[in-house]
Regions:
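Beta-alpha-beta core module
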Residues: 154-159, 163-164, 224-270
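Hydrophobic hinge/microswitch elements
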Residues: 130-133, 138-141, 148, 197-251
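Alpha-helical linker/hinge and terminal dimerization helices associated
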Residues: 42-43, 64-86, 284
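Short helix-boundary/capping micro-motifs
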Residues: 11-28
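Secondary-structure junction motif
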Residues: 189-210, 273-281, 291-292
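Central regulatory/effector-binding core of bacterial HTH transcription factors
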Residues: 90-153, 219
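Flexible hinge/capping segments at coil-to-helix
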Residues: 87, 155-191
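A short LG(V/I)-centered, amphipathic sequence patch enriched
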Residues: 40-59
Length: 294
């Protein structure tokens, strides 16, 4: 079954323009435009609204999008199952992932996974928004994804790791090495606040501690916070996972009462995932268990 038109349509929606979609698909721009026009003619509706700024879905496009995604997902499953029957381990797994996992886990997970399954390919979809990752899994944009649990989305999830929140201070700070770290210090010293992604997680920790920090800087990346703290510009709090293999000269301190976020991996329906996705999810679970069990 030739689903090229559907695949071109989905990639165009993802990229927001014919030009960007053509580059990713190794098509000409006119080829992408022709494929979309042919699909619209075949279906008898206008799927995309064209403008100089790019393309957006029409109301009809929004209505048909889930069905087109499901058709392409089913086609991938058929192709992968056929290859399984031939004794081949191939496929593409699209993984939605947030920063700390993509930096600290994914390179090592992918390396060990591909030693077993060298012909399975990956597409990593970065986002630091739990709701966006959950939506990608639900609508088929991603085959699986890492989420902070619990999630309100109706997904099948497996808990991987409890990630503890820590305070970080410059190496020469008066509170460096102070255990437990006093929460009131967050109000007494300049605080660097991460505003990347779902910053409600940080706010929940601060609310539980009962403090309103002395926010002097608002930044978008964890690595920037580490660099600023190491230079003595302030203090902050950060997930322990992001501090793994940290090379900045900062001191990590624990609160008297530990605070955690739960990291999990999720799929839309564990009974309907592709063989490649199943193998990857199982590999991730084993890898995390082995890493933190000893």
């Amino acid at each position: 079954m030739d689903l090229t038109k559907y695949q071109v349509f989905l990639k165009t929606v993802e990229c927001g323009s014919f030009t960007a979609a053509a580059q990713q698909l190794s098509f000409t721009q006119s080829g992408v435009s022709h494929a979309i026009s042919g699909l619209e003619e075949e279906l008898g509706v206008t799927l995309l609204s064209r403008s100089r700024g790019g393309v957006t879905l029409t109301a009809d496009g929004w209505a048909l999008m889930p069905y087109i995604q499901e058709i392409c997902r089913q086609q991938r499953s058929i192709e992968e199952r056929a290859k399984d029957l031939q004794g081949l381990e191939t496929g593409v797994v699209r993984v939605a992932v947030f920063t700390s996992v993509s930096v600290q886990w994914m390179p090592y997970i992918l390396k060990s996974f591909r030693e077993q399954y060298p012909n399975i390919e990956f597409e990593l979809l970065p986002s630091n928004y739990n709701t966006e990752i959950a939506r990608w899994i639900q609508d088929g944009t991603a085959d699986c994804g890492f989420l902070v649990l619990p999630t309100e989305a109706n997904l099948d999830c497996w808990l991987l790791q409890r990630d503890q929140w820590k305070a970080i201070v410059p190496w020469d700070h008066p509170l460096a090495g102070r255990e437990p770290f006093p929460p009131e210090a967050l109000t007494q010293y300049p605080f660097i606040l991460l505003e990347e992604g779902d910053d409600y997680e940080i706010q929940e920790v601060l609310d539980t501690l009962g403090v309103q920090p002395n926010v002097q800087y608002r930044v978008q990346q964890d690595q920037v916070i580490l660099a600023m703290v190491s230079c003595g510009l302030g203090i902050s709090i950060m997930e322990e996972l992001m501090l793994d293999r940290n090379e900045y000269p900062v001191v990590v301190c624990s609160f008297a009462k530990p605070f955690y976020r739960n990291i999990g991996i999720c799929v839309k329906d564990k009974r309907a995932i592709s063989r490649s996705t199943y193998r990857f999810v199982e590999h991730v679970r084993r890898w995390v268990l082995e890493k933190y069990s000893g």
